[in-house]
A protein has these predicted regions:
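Sec-dependent N-terminal signal peptides
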Residues: 3-15
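Generic detector of short alpha-helix boundary/capping microenvironments
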Residues: 7, 22-23, 90
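Boundary at the C-terminal end of the N-terminal hydrophobic targeting segment
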Residues: 17-19
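Short N-proximal segments of mature Sec-exported proteins
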Residues: 23-73
């Protein structure tokens, strides 16, 4: 009986932990990659990319950075990883397909992320 209670407790506890939205290692890595892609996109000159895409990238990068820190990613490590992605992508043209794939991944992974990014865009604080 005791083992049954302990097993039920562990099962319920792990279900709640998963429901809180904690990311797996692979999900964190992909989210950091997408944040880096948005970061690199935000550095593309306005003459080469529409302003709305630059603003979206700024807002998405800000949202994801905050989200990842809340998920327990160390801010210094996050910044180092973002710089690695930017170093690879800086100076390259905007990739619509890659950015859309990141949008789809993030919007599916993080509940209400699309609305939160839209709020940042509308607020002008990004």
């Amino acid at each position: 009986m005791r083992y049954l209670i302990i097993s039920l407790f562990l099962l319920i506890n792990s279900t709640f932990a998963f429901a809180d939205g904690h990311l797996t290692k692979d999900q964190k890595a992909q989210t950091i990659e997408c944040a880096g892609i948005y970061y690199a996109n935000s550095m593309i000159p306005q003459a080469e990319l529409e302003l709305d895409k630059i603003v979206h990238s700024f807002a998405a990068k800000k949202f994801l950075s905050s989200y990842l820190i809340k998920e327990g990613v160390n801010e210094d490590n996050l910044n180092k990883e973002l710089i690695k992605v930017v170093d690879v992508r800086y100076g390259k043209p905007y990739e619509e397909k890659t950015t859309n794939e990141c949008d789809s991944f993030i919007f599916e992974l993080i509940p209400n992320s699309k609305n939160e990014i839209e709020k940042l865009i509308k607020s002008g604080i990004y």
